[in-house]
Amino acid sequence: MSAEVAIRHRQGAFLLDVAFTAGKGVTALFGPSGAGKTSIVHVLAGLTRPDRGRIVLEGHTVLDTDKGVFVPPEKRRAGLVFQDVRLFPHMSVETNLLFGWRRMGKRADAAEIARIVRLLGLEKLLQRSPKHLSGGEKSRVALGRALLATPDILLL
């Protein structure tokens, strides 16, 4: 993943004005509580529209306020794992994992699903309801769902 980001966004009295370039690999944003890290992640994912800015992910412009470009979240190929884990309570772990695939109209790749399930140690949990999972298990299911969507960028 490579990203070019330049955004300006006001939330009440708070002004977020940031510009950075992230090359392929792992990039981390550090800062104190309230510094705007989550706001930046939400703008990258397309959940929040900044007042001004431009975002290029993997060479594709997903936001350019000057040109009226806004690619919606579901078309950004961005996987997002929220701070507060969000699973569908009426679905099994397996159905939660496959949700992103179904939303994108993809056919499930059994080998990739098995690889992610093994990687995250979810083999024995697939038929469980989220209400019967520990916090860590819920986090692993949410991460698996994001990974199975084969995102260009994974936002945690």
Label the predicted regions.
Residues 60-65, 108-125:
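Conserved ABC ATPase "signature" region
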Residues 129-133, 137:
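Conserved ABC ATPase signature
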Residues 143:
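Hydrophobic anchor residue at the start of the ABC signature
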Residues 148-152:
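A short, proline-enriched helix->beta-strand linker immediately N-terminal to the Walker B motif
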Residues 62-79, 103:
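ABC ATPase NBD coupling module
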Residues 91, 95-110, 119:
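ABC-type ATPase nucleotide-binding domains, specifically the catalytic core motifs of the NBD
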Residues 154-156:
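Catalytic Walker B motif of ABC-type/P-loop ATPase nucleotide-binding domains
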